[in-house]
C-alpha cells in the first residue's frame, strides 16, 4: 500500500502544481477527484503510513490551541513609502550616488499579509507571519491549507522564501455571502478577511476560504544574482510569482508602469495598494545596505488614497505617552476604503492652523498610508461658520499648562506624573512589539491604573493573580493567563524591554542594533554617547536621547527594580563579537555544502562576528564555497576576494 500511496501523493501534488501554479492542468477535475478519493481511502485504512507531503493535509480539519511565537532567522524589514513622482526621483538620486547605472525591477504591492515559508530538505516545516519583523507567529498548519503553497519542493533544499498571502476578490465575495446568510458580520475588505482567516484556530475554515499567495523573495542567502533571476527560480520551485512586473532603466519607465497599473488596478482579481521598486542587482543592493528600518535599495510607491467628504462635528484632544497632545476629529460617518470612518486625526495644532480648519467645516477625509483616517483639507465652498476651533491651554488629563515649543508642531504636556502619559506608557510596554504580554491590553491597563495597582512598568511584575480578580469582568481563568503571560515576558530578549521603555527616537530596530552591540541593557547604560553614535545605522540623535534618559535618577531606579523582579536585561540573539575571528567581515555563502546546513553555516559565521550577505560585491571580504558555486565564485575571483571552503569553516 505504501507504494501506491507514494504514487498518488506524487501525482496529486504534480497535478495541483499544474493547476494552481502553472495554470495548465493535464488532467480533468473528475480524474483528480477520483485519485484524491482513492488516497483518502488508503490513508483512512493505513493512518500510520500517511506521508508528510500528502495533499489531504490541505483540507483536514484540526483545532489549534493557539499560535506559538517564532523567531525569524532572516528579519523582515519594512519598505520606505513614496507618494509622488518627486519622491521617486529623490529615491533614484540616492541610489545613483552609490550605483552608477542601476536597473530597477517593479512589482505589484499585494494588499495581503506578509508570510515567510521555511523548507528543510524540500519539505515545508514552518509558515510564519511577519509579526514585528524579528518575531512572528507560527501558522504552519493554516498555511498548509492554502492550496498554491507547495508542501514539498522538487529539490531537497534548505530555503526560506517570503511573499504575501491574500484573499482573491472572488473568494472575498463568496466568504461574505456565506457570512451574510449565517447572520455573521461581513469582512470590510479582502485584507481583513485574509488576516481573520489566517488567525483561525480551526484549520478547516482556512481550507474553505480559498486564500492564495504570491512569493517574491528568497530570504535565505540568495542563490541568484538578481531579483528577476530570483523570481524565475522561485517559479521553477513551484511557487506562484506575480507575472505583472518590468525591468526599468529610469524613473520615466517606472512612472509609466505605475500609471499603467493604476488604470488596470480595479480590474485585477486581487487588491493591490502600490508598486514596489527595487534595485535588481543583488550586489548593488548589498552596496546600498539598510537604514535602521528599511532597505536603501527599495521603495514602495503608494497609490493616492480614496477621498470622501464629511462634516466636522467636534474635536477630542488626547495625550500620548511622550506628552504630545493630539486632536482627533469626530465626523459624520463615511465609507472609506472598505470601512466606516467616523473619526480621523487632525495631526497637531499647527496642522489645524495651516489648513484653517474651523467649527462645523466640511472636510476631505482619506486614509494615510491606506491605514489611518486623516483630515486632508477643508472644502471652503461649503463653510457654514467662521468660528475657530477651541485650542486647549491645559492638559486634558492632568490639567497642567500645555507648552508649544518653537521647534515643535504639537502641544505638549511636560508633567512626568501625568496619568495619561503613564497609562499610555504602560500600554506601549505591554504591546506586541515591546514586551508582548498577551491579554494585557488597553482595557486591563486602564483598570489596573484606576485601581492604583500599577504606577510604572516595574509594578506590572509585582502583580499577583488575586490582583486581577479585583478588576471588573476578570475571572479566575483570565487572571491566571494574565499572570502567566507577565511571568513569561520576563524571559524576553532585552531589545524588547529597551523598546518597551519608550525612550524617544529608540524604535524596535534601533533597540535590536543596540543590544546586538552592547549585549545587555546594563552595558548600554554604562556606554558613552560617542560609542553609541558610531554604530552603523544609528547616529547622534539616538545617542543623545539615550544619554538624556539614562542620566535621570528615575531610569536607574526603574532598571534596578525590573532586575529585582526577575526581568531579563541581556540580549538573547546573535551578538556582535568585537574580537572574534571574523569580526567586522562581510561574508558570502555559495554552493552546496556537504556536511553543514546552510543555516548552520550562517549561524557559525555570525557567531564568529561576520555579517553574512547574499551577493558578492566590492564590499565582500570573504566567500565560503561549496560544490557548484557558480557565478558568485567567479565574481569573487574577478574582484580578488579571498575564497575559503567548508572544511576551513568547520576548523574555526
From Swiss-Prot:
It catalyses: NAD(+) + (deoxyribonucleotide)n-3'-hydroxyl + 5'-phospho-(deoxyribonucleotide)m = (deoxyribonucleotide)n+m + AMP + beta-nicotinamide D-nucleotide. It holds the Pfam family BRCT. Its EC number is 6.5.1.2. Keywords: DNA damage, DNA repair, DNA replication, Ligase, Magnesium, Manganese, Metal-binding, NAD, Zinc. NAD(+) binds at residues 29-33, 78-79, 107, 130, 164, 278, 302. GO terms for molecular function: DNA binding; DNA ligase (NAD+) activity; metal ion binding. CDD domains: BRCT_DNA_ligase_like, LIGANc. InterPro entries: BRCT_dom, BRCT_dom_sf, DisA/LigA_HHH, DNA_ligase, DNA_ligase_AS, DNA_ligase_CS, DNAligase_adenylation, DNAligase_N. Residues 577-652 form the BRCT domain. It is an enzyme of class 6 (ligase). SUPFAM superfamilies: BRCT domain, DNA ligase/mRNA capping enzyme, catalytic domain, Nucleic acid-binding proteins, RuvA domain 2-like. Zn(2+) binds at residues 395, 398, 413, 418. GO terms for biological process: DNA repair; DNA replication. The active site is at residue 109. SMART domains: BRCT, HhH1, LIGANc. PROSITE patterns: BRCT (PS50172), DNA_LIGASE_N1 (PS01055), DNA_LIGASE_N2 (PS01056). Transmembrane segments: none annotated. It comes from the Bacteria. HAMAP family: DNA_ligase_A. DNA ligase that catalyzes the formation of phosphodiester linkages between 5'-phosphoryl and 3'-hydroxyl groups in double-stranded DNA using NAD as a coenzyme and as the energy source for the reaction. It is essential for DNA replication and repair of damaged DNA. Belongs to the NAD-dependent DNA ligase family. LigA subfamily. This is DNA ligase. The lineage of its organism: Bacteria, Bacillati, Bacillota, Bacilli, Lactobacillales.
Amino acid at each position: 500500500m505504501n507504494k501506491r500511496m507514494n504514487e498518488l501523493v506524487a501525482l496529486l501534488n504534480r497535478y495541483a502544481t499544474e493547476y494552481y501554479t502553472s495554470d495548465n492542468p493535464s488532467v480533468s477535475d473528475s480524474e483528480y477527484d477520483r485519485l484524491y478519493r482513492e488516497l483518502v481511502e488508503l490513508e483512512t485504512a493505513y493512518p500510520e503510513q500517511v506521508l508528510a507531503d500528502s495533499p489531504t493535509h490541505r483540507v483536514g480539519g484540526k483545532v489549534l490551541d493557539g499560535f506559538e511565537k517564532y523567531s525569524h532567522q532572516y528579519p523582515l524589514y519594512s519598505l520606505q513609502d513614496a507618494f509622488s513622482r518627486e519622491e521617486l526621483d529623490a529615491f533614484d538620486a540616492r541610489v545613483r550616488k552609490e550605483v552608477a547605472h542601476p536597473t530597477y525591477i517593479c512589482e505589484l504591492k499585494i494588499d495581503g499579509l506578509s508570510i515567510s515559508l521555511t523548507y528543510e530538505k524540500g519539505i515545508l516545516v514552518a509558515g510564519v507571519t511577519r509579526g514585528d519583523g524579528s518575531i512572528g507567529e507560527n501558522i504552519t498548519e493554516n498555511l498548509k491549507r492554502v492550496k498554491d503553497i507547495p508542501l514539498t519542493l522538487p529539490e531537497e533544499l534548505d530555503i526560506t522564501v517570503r511573499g504575501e498571502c491574500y484573499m482573491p476578490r472572488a473568494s472575498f465575495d463568496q466568504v461574505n455571502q456565506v457570512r451574510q446568510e449565517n447572520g455573521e458580520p461581513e469582512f470590510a475588505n479582502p485584507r481583513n478577511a485574509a488576516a481573520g482567516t489566517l488567525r483561525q484556530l480551526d484549520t478547516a475554515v482556512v481550507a474553505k476560504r480559498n486564500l492564495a499567495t504570491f512569493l517574491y523573495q528568497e530570504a535565505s542567502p540568495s542563490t541568484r544574482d538578481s531579483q528577476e533571476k530570483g523570481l524565475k527560480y522561485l517559479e521553477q520551485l513551484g511557487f506562484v510569482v506575480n507575472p505583472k512586473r518590468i525591468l526599468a532603466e529610469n524613473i520615466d519607465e517606472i512612472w509609466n508602469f505605475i500609471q499603467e497599473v493604476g488604470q488596470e488596478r480595479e480590474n485585477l482579481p486581487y487588491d493591490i495598494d502600490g508598486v514596489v521598486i527595487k534595485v535588481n542587482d543583488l550586489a548593488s543592493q548589498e552596496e546600498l545596505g539598510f537604514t535602521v528600518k528599511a532597505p536603501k535599495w527599495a521603495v514602495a510607491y503608494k497609490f493616492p488614497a480614496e477621498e470622501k467628504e464629511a462634516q466636522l462635528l467636534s474635536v477630542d484632544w488626547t495625550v500620548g505617552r511622550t506628552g504630545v497632545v493630539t486632536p482627533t476629529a469626530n465626523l459624520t460617518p463615511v465609507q472609506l476604503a472598505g470601512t466606516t470612518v467616523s473619526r480621523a486625526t487632525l495631526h497637531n495644532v499647527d496642522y489645524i492652523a495651516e489648513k484653517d480648519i474651523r467649527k462645523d467645516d466640511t472636510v476631505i477625509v482619506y486614509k494615510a498610508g491606506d491605514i489611518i483616517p486623516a483630515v486632508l483639507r477643508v472644502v471652503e465652498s461649503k463653510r457654514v461658520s467662521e468660528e475657530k476651533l477651541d485650542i486647549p491651554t491645559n492638559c486634558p488629563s492632568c490639567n497642567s499648562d500645555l507648552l508649544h515649543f518653537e521647534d515643535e508642531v504639537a502641544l505638549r504636556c511636560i508633567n512626568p506624573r501625568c496619568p495619561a502619559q503613564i497609562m499610555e506608557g504602560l500600554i506601549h510596554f505591554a504591546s506586541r512589539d515591546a514586551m508582548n504580554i498577551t491579554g494585557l491590553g488597553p482595557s486591563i491597563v486602564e483598570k489596573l491604573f484606576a485601581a492604583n495597582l500599577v504606577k510604572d512598568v516595574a509594578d506590572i511584575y509585582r502583580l499577583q493573580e488575586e490582583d486581577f480578580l479585583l478588576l471588573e469582568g476578570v475571572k479566575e481563568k483570565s487572571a491566571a493567563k494574565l499572570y502567566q503571560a507577565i511571568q513569561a515576558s520576563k524571559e524576553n530578549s532585552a531589545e524588547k524591554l529597551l523598546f518597551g521603555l519608550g525612550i524617544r527616537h529608540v524604535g524596535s530596530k534601533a533597540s535590536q542594533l543596540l543590544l546586538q552591540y552592547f549585549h545587555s541593557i546594563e552595558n548600554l547604560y554604562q556606554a558613552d554617547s560617542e560609542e553609541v553614535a558610531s554604530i552603523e545605522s544609528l547616529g547622534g540623535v539616538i545617542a543623545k536621547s539615550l544619554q538624556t534618559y539614562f542620566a535621570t535618577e528615575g531610569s536607574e531606579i526603574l532598571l534596578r527594580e525590573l532586575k529585582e523582579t526577575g526581568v531579563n536585561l541581556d540580549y538573547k540573539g546573535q551578538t556582535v563579537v568585537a574580537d572574534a575571528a571574523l569580526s567586522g567581515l562581510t561574508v558570502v555563502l555559495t554552493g552546496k555544502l556537504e556536511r553543514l546546513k546552510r543555516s548552520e553555516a550562517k549561524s557559525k559565521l555570525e557567531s564568529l562576528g561576520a555579517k553574512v550577505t547574499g551577493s558578492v560585491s566590492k564590499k565582500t571580504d570573504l566567500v565560503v564555497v561549496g560544490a557548484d558555486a557558480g557565478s558568485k565564485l567567479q565574481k569573487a575571483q574577478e574582484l580578488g576576494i579571498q575564497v575559503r571552503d567548508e572544511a576551513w569553516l568547520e576548523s574555526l
